[in-house]
UniProtKB/Swiss-Prot annotation:
This is TATA box-binding protein-like 2. GO terms for biological process: DNA-templated transcription initiation; embryo development ending in birth or egg hatching; embryonic pattern specification; hemopoiesis. Pfam families: TBP (PF00352). The gene is tbpl2. TATA box-binding transcription factor. Members of the TBP family are differentially required to regulate transcription and development during early embryogenesis. It comes from Takifugu rubripes (Japanese pufferfish).
Amino acid sequence: MDESALERYFEDSIANDSGFILEEELGLHSPALSSTQDSTYLSGRAGPSRESGAELDLSFLPDDLSTQEELGHHDNTAQAEDRAVSQDSAVCLDYDSQNSATPAATFDQQNPSLLGGGVHNSPFYSMTPMTPMTPMTPVTERSGIIPQLQNIVSTVNLGCPLDLKFIALQARNAEYNPKRFAAVIMRIREPRTTALIFSSGKMVCTGAKSEEQSRLAARKYARVVQKLGFPARFMDFKIQNMVASCDVCFPIRLEGLVLTHQQFSSYEPELFPGLIYRMVKPRIVLLIFVSGKVVLTGAKERAEIYEAFENIYPILRGFRKQ
């Protein structure tokens, strides 16, 4: 090839390059050249550049996925900025926190599902633990009411046989009617009590308001019998029954109470106006009235009366008339 041919070839190449540059500046593209460049670009993107680890073109994916990628990138950037700020001084921390407050607030308003530091992004939501309800028991709800003792029944053994007719004739404040009741009925004023004296030497004392009064009254009756010439002794004193009463100060629905506690209670208003409640532990019988008055009987110690009332009080509160 001669030199003139080479010169013509280089001149044509230069002319073609200058024309291409001019077309680009004027915004003119030939279809053939554009298709060639697009195919070259796509082949280059599909080939070596993917192997080199460059990012893929995700423009053909749905908008939701692209938005999630952008939000994830934004979240990672914000976390990186927070870590960087935590390493700076206190002054820089205040300044950066003020600047970063606006985009964080905007991001939370636009995406309420991402609030809470990313907790709601996980498939498992943190649940607030529920406080178990503790059932009401007599220990947790004190009534503040103390039943008052009304009567104490005690027994004692005088240890000798007695002539009841002679005792009734010699003693004052004594009566004896064997046709009606086979015992001498004797009364004293202090403490105000009544005694039933049997021919076997057994005696029952009733009417005392406390354990001490009951014992004192029984000793006085034994002394009277001893003064009449009988070798009476004071043996086996024992309290058999204690009766107490109180007022809960609110009316009670006895019909609902007997339906709920059929196993322990009975209510026959035509026969007796009060509900009879038989408590198992302690073994106490309660008479409950509509007015709120409660009578407790069957106890041998004060503690049993107090325990029984504290057990029944929450139940009565549940059936209070509105």
